[in-house]
Amino acid sequence: MELIMNNTVKTTLLAFLLGFSAFASAGHHSGATHEGTQVKHVGFSQMGDPATVLEVKTEASAALRPGDVRVKVLASPINPSDLLQIAGNYGVDPVLPARPGSEGVGRVTEVSADVQALKVGQQVLLASGSAWAEELVAPAAGFLPLP
């Protein structure tokens, strides 16, 4: 546990840098992130010290499937549970490779045609995990509307 907490500063910096790119672009784009756009996320393929196993990765934005929503991540905290899970000390090990981030807040940028509960522009709580990313594409049930 001490090793994890000593490396929290490095992990915080990594998450801040990823989050900064999302915040920096928030005011400069007026539409949805389109399929094929390159987006960043934090991931890991082995458990261990978060400061050494976490990587910022880039990949093409995922296509929406029926029932899916695309959300631009606005903020995602670093939870102690995230750090413990990355280190393999949480009690439930993730399927590797994994994407950390148990919660966050985002804005809906696109919805599939069959989604009625969420609308473009709506702020949502990210409840589907993998929140250390610039955007998430997941079933609408993984997002809770915010007032």
Regions found by a protein language model. Give the residues of each.
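NAD(P)H dinucleotide-binding glycine-rich loop of Rossmann-like/cofactor-binding domains
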Residues: 84, 95, 123-147
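Gram-negative bacterial Sec-dependent N-terminal signal peptides
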Residues: 5-26
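Short structural boundary motif marking the start of a folded domain
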Residues: 35-42
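Conserved hydrophobic/aromatic beta-strand scaffold that supports enzyme active sites
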Residues: 56-58, 105-107, 135-137, 143
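Glycine-rich beta-strand-centered segment in the early N-terminal region that forms part
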Residues: 60-77, 89-131
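Cleaved targeting-peptide boundary
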Residues: 26-35
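Cytochrome P450 core scaffold surrounding the K-helix E-X-X-R motif
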Residues: 81-87
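Short N-terminal binding/cap micro-motifs at the start of the first secondary-structure element
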Residues: 48-54, 80-81, 117
